[in-house]
Amino acid sequence: MGNRCARTSCCRKLWSCICCCSNNNNNSYGQTRSQHGSKGKVHPVSRIEKWEEKITEANNHGKILVVNFSAPWCVPCKKIEPVFRDLASRYPSMIFVTVDVEELAEFSNEWNVEATPTVVFLKDGRQMDKLVGAETSELQKKTAAAADLFLRKP
């Protein structure tokens, strides 16, 4: 519960407080940050036109699109942000974007985003995997698995 924030505005402050006070010891933030200090290319998406540009780019080049649905007030979102950047650096064959759920609320609802952060993995515009919450080790595993699938493509 402390690794994700509810998206409803009435619960936002309560969730932020709960998330901020949680202590999750099964993340590798410090390890990832120290091993990979460079910033990866994460494309911010706050307009539907930018989304369409990135999904078209991924589809045209046969790349996996990794989408981080995030909110500026979400403490767990801030926790995974450096890990997400690091993954973008490590996996240049994938496209990493962060969608601002406040700027694109209706769009986020279409993707069934009920809490932040939610990370969705897309191939050819279709969801292949999803992670809800700031479980950094799980995010790393799912990203590595998606990259492995990309490398095995026919």
UniProtKB/Swiss-Prot annotation:
Cell location: Cytoplasm
Entry annotated with the keyword S-adenosyl-L-methionine: no
A cellular-component GO term for this protein: cytoplasm
Transport in keyword set: yes
Official protein name in the record: Putative thioredoxin H10
InterPro entries named in the record: Thioredoxin-like_sf, Thioredoxin_CS, Thioredoxin_domain, Thioredoxin_H-type-like
Function, in words: Probable thiol-disulfide oxidoreductase that may be involved in the redox regulation of a number of cytosolic enzymes.
Gene3D superfamilies (alphabetical): Glutaredoxin (3.40.30.10)
Similarity comment text for this entry: Belongs to the thioredoxin family.
Active site: 74 (nucleophile), 77 (nucleophile)
